[in-house]
C-alpha cells in the first residue's frame, strides 16, 4: 500500500470517528429532552404496534380529555389533581403550578411529566388544546364588519 492510500485511509477513519463522536454527544445531550407521546389507553395497555408500555420514572407526554368532575384543587397551594381519559382508559395527573387559561373539564390537554406507580403522572407542564375553530378577536371583528357591508360592495365593478 502506498503512502497516498494510507493517508486517505487515516483521513477517512478520522472523519468517521469524529462523526461518531459528534452523533454520540448530540444524542447524550438530547436524551433528557426526548419525551415519547402516549394516550391514556397506551399507558394502560401499551402501544398498539409494539405493545410497549412506559416504565415507572419515564419522562413522557400524555394527551387526552380532562374528565368531568375530576379536577381537585388544594386550597392552600397551587397543587391540582385531575384525570385525563380517552376511549380506552384514564390516568390520574398531579400538577403544581398555574394552569393555562384554556384548561377546563371536558377540554383536551397534553401533560408532560414522569410516570409514577399506579399509572399516575407527576406533571411538570400542562398544555391546554384550543378549538381548531378558534379565531383571534381582531380577525373575528374584521369578519363581522365585512359581513355587515351592503351587497353592492361585493359586486364586480365590471358588471
Curated annotation (Swiss-Prot):
Stretches of the chain found on the membrane's Periplasmic side: 30-159
Protein name per its UniProtKB record: Cytochrome c-type biogenesis protein CcmE
Organism ancestry: Bacteria, Pseudomonadati, Pseudomonadota, Gammaproteobacteria, Enterobacterales
Cytoplasmic domain ranges by topology: 1-8
Region: Disordered, residue numbers: 132-159
GO MF term (any one): metal ion binding
Subcellular compartments: Cell inner membrane
UniProt cross-references to SUPFAM superfamilies, sorted A to Z: Heme chaperone CcmE
Highest taxon, organism lineage: Bacteria
Protein family (similarity comment): Belongs to the CcmE/CycJ family.
Functional description taken from the UniProt entry: Heme chaperone required for the biogenesis of c-type cytochromes. Transiently binds heme delivered by CcmC and transfers the heme to apo-cytochromes in a process facilitated by CcmF and CcmH.
The entry's keywords: Cell inner membrane, Cell membrane, Cytochrome c-type biogenesis, Heme, Iron, Membrane, Metal-binding, Signal-anchor, Transmembrane, Transmembrane helix
Membrane topology: Single-pass type II membrane protein
Organism: Shigella sonnei (strain Ss046)
Annotated TM spans: 9-29
Amino acid at each position: 500500500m502506498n503512502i497516498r492510500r494510507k493517508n486517505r485511509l487515516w483521513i477517512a477513519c478520522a472523519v468517521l470517528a469524529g462523526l461518531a463522536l459528534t452523533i454520540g454527544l448530540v444524542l447524550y445531550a438530547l436524551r433528557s429532552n426526548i419525551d415519547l407521546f402516549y394516550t391514556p389507553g397506551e399507558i394502560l395497555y401499551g402501544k398498539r404496534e409494539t405493545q410497549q408500555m412506559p416504565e415507572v420514572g419515564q419522562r413522557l407526554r400524555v394527551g387526552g380529555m380532562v374528565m368531568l368532575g375530576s379536577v381537585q384543587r388544594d386550597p392552600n397551594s397551587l397543587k391540582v389533581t385531575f384525570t385525563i381519559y380517552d376511549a380506552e382508559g384514564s390516568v390520574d395527573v398531579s400538577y403544581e403550578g398555574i394552569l393555562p387559561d384554556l384548561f377546563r373539564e371536558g377540554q383536551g390537554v397534553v401533560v408532560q411529566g414522569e410516570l409514577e406507580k399506579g399509572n399516575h403522572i407527576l406533571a411538570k407542564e400542562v398544555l391546554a388544546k384550543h378549538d381548531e375553530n378558534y379565531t383571534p378577536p381582531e380577525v373575528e371583528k374584521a369578519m363581522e364588519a365585512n359581513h355587515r357591508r351592503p351587497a353592492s360592495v361585493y359586486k364586480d365593478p365590471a358588471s
